[in-house]
């Protein structure tokens, strides 16, 4: 097998996820109850057998660092690792100025490892992918660069790099986040082909392009705007169709599932995808597991069954993590992170509760995201009067109420 290296860009600030990113990097935001967003890309590489991963961090990385150090210990004796790489300022006293600059400032890692092929992936998407299939495509095409892509609705095209390909899958056009004149897919005027932000380079070509870009004072030093857009006309740049990627244990409904969780509404919906009876993305695929840090928390506990008084502890259509106690309350269509407590006579619906959230008695909460260490006092109602909620919390365009970490909530 060719010598491979994965460089994972995990330094994103994630401003559109505020307030969830006020105290943590975007890849460290909890997802699906017991995971962090970064776990999905790391699990894809681990399951694919790519076991040399460098995670480039920058913005408020403490919780991300701790999570990776605690949960991603590979076998050093076999030269397998997930290593955190902070901004080292090797080229001067400055932070990363873009995704391409992040690689340039860490070129020493690539030259030291001497991989034949280098993956450059983001750390802020939710999906399963066997990257070996992308590698095989790259080798078959003799590509210098392969970009993973997925169809998106035309109305969402302005959020992505939009690609045009020929009949052989070679890139013949690329526009980063077009505001007008979107090039649609052949035969389908409703969709455009979007870059997933996942790149596979033949390493020699990567080094050449990164060094060239670093010397361009007018460059944005961004992989989409600066590297891909400049490279496809003079190098062999091909586009890998992610919809053709087949993961063991994955059903037809899940194939091609990929979510950019860069906004609060998108993040909320991707979480809600998990709790459906027949989910479009399942966490229960033993043949392609999502790995994460393990915690020594006790089992979930449901207590009280006084149906006469309505004091019944139970959860329906929900994901409930270890250490939770549902004490005479009801969680419906929810995702509960570890050590959540829902007390008697309370109803929580269509919500995401982060670790160590405590819901007092007689509360009614719906369509909310509650960050860690929040205490909701008894008799509190959230999600039923959005005008009132806007005075206290952040409310998204679609009406999701977001409560920041450790906020003191008044009844």
Swiss-Prot record:
Any one Gene Ontology BP term: glycogen biosynthetic process
InterPro entries assigned to the protein according to its UniProt record, in alphabetical order: ADP-Glc_PPase, ADP_Glu_pyroP_CS, GlgC_bac, GlmU/GlgC-like_hexapep, NTP_transferase_dom, Nucleotide-diphossugar_trans, Trimer_LpxA-like_sf
Gene Ontology molecular function, alphabetical: ATP binding; glucose-1-phosphate adenylyltransferase activity
Record-listed E.C. numbers: 2.7.7.27
Pathway given in the UniProt record: Glycan biosynthesis; glycogen biosynthesis
SUPFAM superfamilies noted in UniProt: Nucleotide-diphospho-sugar transferases, Trimeric LpxA-like enzymes
Keywords: ATP-binding, Carbohydrate metabolism, Glycogen biosynthesis, Glycogen metabolism, Nucleotide-binding, Nucleotidyltransferase, Transferase
Residues where alpha-D-glucose 1-phosphate binds: 161, 176-177, 195
Pfam families to which the protein is assigned, alphabetical: Hexapep_GlmU, NTP_transferase
Subunit details: Homotetramer.
Family recorded in the similarity comment: Belongs to the bacterial/plant glucose-1-phosphate adenylyltransferase family.
Function field: Involved in the biosynthesis of ADP-glucose, a building block required for the elongation reactions to produce glycogen. Catalyzes the reaction between ATP and alpha-D-glucose 1-phosphate (G1P) to produce pyrophosphate and ADP-Glc.
NCBIfam families in alphabetical order: glgC, PRK00725.1, PRK00844.1
HAMAP family: GlgC (MF_00624)
Official protein name in the record: Glucose-1-phosphate adenylyltransferase
Species name: Anaeromyxobacter sp. (strain Fw109-5)
